[in-house]
Amino acid sequence: MTFYDHTAIEPKWQAFWADNHTFKTGTDASKPKFYALDMFPYPSGAGLHVGHPEGYTATDILSRFKRAQGHNVLHPMGWDAFGLPAEQYAMDTGNDPAEFTAENIANFKRQINALGFSYDWDREVNTTDPNYYKWTQWIFTKLYEKGLAYEAEVPVNWVEELGTAIANEEVLPDGTSERGGYPVVRKPMRQWMLKITAYAERLLEDLEEVDWPESIKDMQRNWIGKSTGANVTFKVKDTDKDFTVFTTRPDTLFGATYAVLAPEHALVDAITTADQAEAVADYKRQASLKSDLARTDLAKEKTGVWTGSYAINPVNGNEMPVWIADYVLASYGTGAIMAVPAHDERDWEFAKQFNLDIIPVLEGGNVEEAAFTEDGLHINSGFLDGLDKASAIAKMVEWLEAEGVGNEKVTYRLRDWLFSRQRYWGEPIPIIHWEDGTSTAVPESELPLVLPVTKDIRPSGTGESPLANVTDWLEVTREDGVKGRRETNTMPQWAGSSWYYLRYIDPHNTEKLADEELLKQWLPVDIYVGGAEHAVLHLLYARFWHKVLYDLGVVPTKEPFQKLFNQGMILGTSYRDSRGALVATDKVEKRDGSFFHLETGEELEQAPAKMSKSLKNVVNPDDVVEQYGADTLRVYEMFMGPLDASIAWSEEGLEGSRKFLDRVYRLITTKEITEENSGALDKVYNETVKAVTEQVDQMKFNTAIAQLMVFVNAANKEDKLFSDYAKGFVQLIAPFAPHLGEELWQALTASGESISYVPWPSYDESKLVENDVEIVVQIKGKVKAKLVVAKDLSREELQEVALANEKVQAEIAGKDIIKVIAVPNKLVNIVIK
């Protein structure tokens, strides 16, 4: 049997593509454009795993398909190379993070090239390259000039082990850091913030303009968290103080029986009575140690302390005790709430715990047993009694505005983006703080502000980054003799990834971020493929920066990414014991088709789980490429199932994909190729071209491969293969298995040219139509024969054919035919006696 030698074929074609710059981005202005973007990777020390190529293969198939369809294709790759892991490694080993990063990039690039992706490497970007981050810094200076980057003393999520503050989005639900899983505490610090809140409404509205999964849009909508309601002002009894509360349910104001301020609220100390001062101070101290997520956990026990003061409910004059509690956050809304315990679960639990009044103001439920959180007509609410929710809200807002104690208000859950990091390995923030108290941005002519090389990269522990120790870089003097210090905080890893897709369009421009005409030509990105874990952070930040650049006239579109696709996760083979605990693969043996724990002998259940070093089930693509070839890996990952599904890795599936490619190789290299078309494959060939074209366009790669298999099976039944069909088939499979595609194309054409730009095959609609149909012949209601006849025969012709059939004649010999019922294209029923 003939098998192809992937170890010879794949490196040969990779060298050909590199030497000939086969995938250089097209510049023919008369052609349509197609911009296919992968989420660029962080080049970790571990290298690529088999999950990376799944998304990369999808965009590569689309890119190869669109090139063959006559598009200019921009399909680039680069490196999101700043970030904590390289710095952590450098601190642990004493090595330079830049060297470590460069080694990792070289390894990633080697692995990516071994998989045959059609990237235009002339456009490679690296976020740690000063020629790249010059423009990251330039964008920051524009944000600063527009008042969208500002300094503030804010309570931050401080991670002692990382020596830095992290953004809200980087804190996990259990109150630990996304990176490393370390404890997060709240600590007030001077920080750079970006005013993403100024764009909240546009970030929300423009989601309607993009073709993204609805689940991702919903995650962004929830994160932005738009609420329409009212601000209500409460006076503090026997003082000249007051505070404002935002509520989405101003109609329940008659049921507000107490108020809660965040422990950090500016009013707390001023209204706390002497006998409550110690308890309040203690509580504030404890609250400062908890993260926002830990504080707002619905399941946690409710805690709080009374300030000793009362607020006056403006609608009925009732006194309401003012408490502080950590479930109210200073950073959310106004940092104060009015509690309506009859109709809010959290308020109800708090009221029960501290024996506070519960007054129902909506009909329905038993508020002694539980909060009633559904809608009902208003009761115990004076001028709102008998009204429904919408009418009551409108009437209460009208009353608040007329009385001067409130107004209609829209708020957002979205907070400004905490942008500074107290670390070394990031873009320096291009700001100078002068001794006269002013601050200025570094002028464009002095950008990039290059990160200085230093051995001392440990966090200072003072809240400043290690750059505070690099004196000759840190200290500057103005022409007028005024001394200054450079900003020592660096940017987060999200900075470089918020605009990299723009730099690919014009990566070597030294005068500007990118040429306006080129941006007009290529934006927006046509397809962006990556993991759903970036739903909020990266995608929201990139959309924000893009909108700022749109307002500056730099980019011509409101949105960066027209279509987004999230590939699923490739799960590893793993095993569970009877307790549900996962068992590492090196502790498992297979006997008679079952799996057993090597140490305990217990029978285990196979259960796919996320690949991890601890389970020893990480599959390295290098090993797969060596054993089976890159084309096999590509075809297998696309054939596993729908691209957006999470599916377990299977060695058997991999072997199946390799066997299929061997069959393809044999079909083209051993079958007699002829210039004469017998017509036998007309229908299946044209069906295959149509199906593969449509399914690749819709990213249904698994069904496209299934159709290619149908063609191979049909072609193998014939003695000869029509040369046009052989070539067309090789073109169809080439985006999936590009090395094999090139090799077989040369076997058929000996052109010496790549298959990449050969026009995509077309199909003949008339050949898709069946000219023959199968009909059944029934005698006494039982099927006695099946006949293939020309389509659309008349009743008379059908009857004639049926009665002439040998089997039918044998059945009716010597019998009387009572009647014959013929249904064209379906059946002939013969009634005899």
Swiss-Prot record:
Presence of the UniProt keyword Nucleotide-binding in the record: yes
Gene that encodes the chain: leuS
Alphabetical list of InterPro entries matching this protein: aa-tRNA-synth_I_CS (IPR001412), aa-tRNA-synth_Ia (IPR002300), Leu-tRNA-ligase (IPR002302), Leu_tRNA-synth_edit (IPR025709), M/V/L/I-tRNA-synth_anticd-bd (IPR013155), Methionyl/Leucyl_tRNA_Synth (IPR015413), Rossmann-like_a/b/a_fold (IPR014729), tRNAsynth_Ia_anticodon-bd (IPR009080)
UniProt motif 'KMSKS' region: location: 610-614
Locus of motif 'HIGH' region: 41-52
Biological process per Gene Ontology, one example term: leucyl-tRNA aminoacylation
Protein name as it appears in the record: Leucine--tRNA ligase
Family: Belongs to the class-I aminoacyl-tRNA synthetase family.
Source species of the chain: Streptococcus pyogenes serotype M5 (strain Manfredo)
GO molecular function: aminoacyl-tRNA deacylase activity; ATP binding; leucine-tRNA ligase activity
GO cellular component: a single term: cytosol
Highest rank taxon of the organism: Bacteria
Keyword Hydrolase among UniProt keywords: no
PROSITE patterns attached to this UniProt entry: AA_TRNA_LIGASE_I
EC number: 6.1.1.4
Keywords associated with the record: Aminoacyl-tRNA synthetase, ATP-binding, Cytoplasm, Ligase, Nucleotide-binding, Protein biosynthesis
Binding residue positions for ATP: K613
Intracellular or extracellular location(s): Cytoplasm
Cited PANTHER family: LEUCINE--TRNA LIGASE, MITOCHONDRIAL (PTHR43740:SF2), LEUCYL-TRNA SYNTHETASE (PTHR43740)
Reactions catalysed according to its record: tRNA(Leu) + L-leucine + ATP = L-leucyl-tRNA(Leu) + AMP + diphosphate
CDD domains: Anticodon_Ia_Leu_BEm, LeuRS_core
